[in-house]
């Protein structure tokens, strides 16, 4: 990114158990994928660790939900609110993020259907992403550990998550 670049970039691993956001090669958010919602308005009261601490300990006006199941979005509205709040947390140190120029790369399970991919893309856009890209989790894991995914050699990747486990062999960028 150049000195005057207003496009900010983050990578998000939207997991069943935890959500991680990376900015400038640093983990800036690592929180449980949990949202505490007001039962009347269905608005987020807390996300992440704060919502996790409320689980099972709140009064009848508040419910806690895990918006992802088996690596896919199960509750679109809750997922969107969780992503919006976590992106706010990740970007609060930089005033330029308040502009509409946010590029988000989101990891998705390799077995995702078109509907599931669209749900991730839509949630990311509604949460503030101007440009949204998806990448399969095994490919992101391979790139993240420094494997040359374009090399003509096979690399086995095992991605163990809270809702899915994926095993892939990556060679020649595919």
Regions found by a protein language model. Name each.
Residues 1-162, 168-174:
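Nucleotide/phosphate-binding catalytic cleft detector across ATP-hydrolyzing
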């Amino acid at each position: 990114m150049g000195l005057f670049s207003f496009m900010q970039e983050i990578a998000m691993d939207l997991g069943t158990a935890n959500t991680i956001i990376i900015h400038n090669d640093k983990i800036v958010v690592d929180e449980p994928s949990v949202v505490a919602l007001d039962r009347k308005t269905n608005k987020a009261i807390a996300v992440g660790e704060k919502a996790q601490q409320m689980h099972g300990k709140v009064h009848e006006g508040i419910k806690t939900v895990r918006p992802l199941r088996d690596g896919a979005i199960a509750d679109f509205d809750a997922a969107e609110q969780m992503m919006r709040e976590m992106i706010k947390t990740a970007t609060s140190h930089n005033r330029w993020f308040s502009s509409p120029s946010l590029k988000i790369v989101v990891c998705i399970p390799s077995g995702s259907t078109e509907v599931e991919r669209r749900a991730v893309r839509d949630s990311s856009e509604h949460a503030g992403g101007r440009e949204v890209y998806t990448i399969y989790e095994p490919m992101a894991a391979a790139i993240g550990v420094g494997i040359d995914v374009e090399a003509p050699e096979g690399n086995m990747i095992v991605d163990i998550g809270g809702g899915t486990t994926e095993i892939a062999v990556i060679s020649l960028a595919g």
